């Protein structure tokens, strides 16, 4: 199943429109190219409708939010919805400021998202409509563990029903859920938290999988999460004594570029809940 999702991205080469943050825009571009998709980054309101129209998917990321891009996000989202394109929201650091939470809530209210992806602190804040997160990182008190996993799976399913979107929570343990089914994913490595943009890359990457696998968006999201986690494991194994987080980032992108469907199926660690 996962193999087909990966191969569909390579075969269809979806064009993904990213209104993302300028800290990680280069990494998002490269991860999309590595998986076989094509990226475009455009956020001026005078062209977003045209750009969105020629694309297959839209990735909205509020990491470096500003008044100019908020309007562009709404216009691009409405256009993508009208054309039935895949749309993903990454509410980066949503609880860090009033502007972020207000913007994220308005985006969810006015745009139909296929997937909302974030760490557990971001997802909980968005669910509550208020709160705080530790910058763009998950609060340690919110960590998903084996002890609270059942509780968080139930939470993700209910939130999916409330928001009419797949809820994709990334962390040491990942949860991907719609209102009926949930998948728990155990791939990845702790060093992934030591590079800026690993979450942003995952969002862009997941949008490509959604765009290329529109018939099963839940499985497409699971496949993207597994593939990124597997790539993290492969990248970590390549690291030498003098390699650091910059080398790891490059190895991560290389692992996505070289990954086969068979490799993904063999290394993916996930279960249905």
Please provide the spans of the model-predicted regions.
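Electropositive phosphate-/nucleotide-binding environments in soluble metabolic enzymes
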Residues: 3, 22-26, 42-45, 67-70, ...
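Conserved phosphate/ATP/ADP-binding segment of small-molecule kinases
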Residues: 100-182
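Charged C-terminal helix
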Residues: 230-273
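Conserved N-terminal subdomain of the carbohydrate kinase-like
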Residues: 2-89
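Short pre-catalytic strand/loop immediately N-terminal to key active-site residues, enriched for Gly-Thr
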Residues: 185-196
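Glycine/small-residue-rich loop that forms an oxyanion/phosphate-binding "nest" at active or ligand-binding sites
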Residues: 69-118
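Conserved post-catalytic alpha-helical subdomain immediately downstream of the catalytic base
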Residues: 196, 206-248
């Amino acid at each position: 199943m996962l193999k087909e999702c990966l191969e569909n991205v390579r075969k269809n080469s979806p064009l993904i429109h990213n209104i993302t943050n300028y800290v990680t825009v280069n990494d998002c571009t490269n991860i999309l190219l590595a998986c076989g998709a094509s990226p475009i980054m455009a956020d001026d309101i005078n062209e977003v409708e045209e750009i969105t129209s020629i694309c297959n998917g839209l990735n909205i990321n509020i990491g470096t939010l500003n008044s100019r891009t908020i309007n562009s996000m709404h216009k691009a989202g409405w256009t993508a919805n009208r054309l039935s394109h895949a749309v993903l929201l990454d509410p980066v650091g949503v609880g860090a400021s009033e502007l972020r939470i207000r913007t994220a809530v308005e985006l969810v209210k006015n745009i139909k998202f296929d997937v909302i992806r974030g760490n557990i602190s971001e997802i909980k804040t968005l669910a509550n409509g208020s709160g705080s997160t530790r910058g763009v990182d998950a609060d340690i008190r919110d960590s998903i563990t084996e002890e609270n996993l059942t509780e968080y799976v139930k939470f993700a399913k209910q939130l999916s029903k409330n928001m009419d979107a797949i809820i994709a929570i990334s962390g040491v343990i990942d949860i991907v859920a719609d209102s009926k089914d949930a998948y728990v994913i155990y791939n990845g490595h702790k060093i992934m938290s030591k590079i800026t943009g690993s979450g942003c890359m995952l969002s862009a990457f997941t949008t490509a999988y959604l765009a290329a696998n529109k018939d099963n968006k839940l499985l497409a999201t699971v496949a993207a999460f597994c593939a990124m986690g597997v790539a993290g494991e492969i990248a970590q194994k390549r690291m030498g004594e003098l390699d650091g987080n910059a080398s790891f980032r490059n190895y991560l992108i290389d692992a996505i570029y070289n990954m086969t469907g068979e490799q993904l199926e063999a290394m993916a660690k996930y279960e249905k809940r």
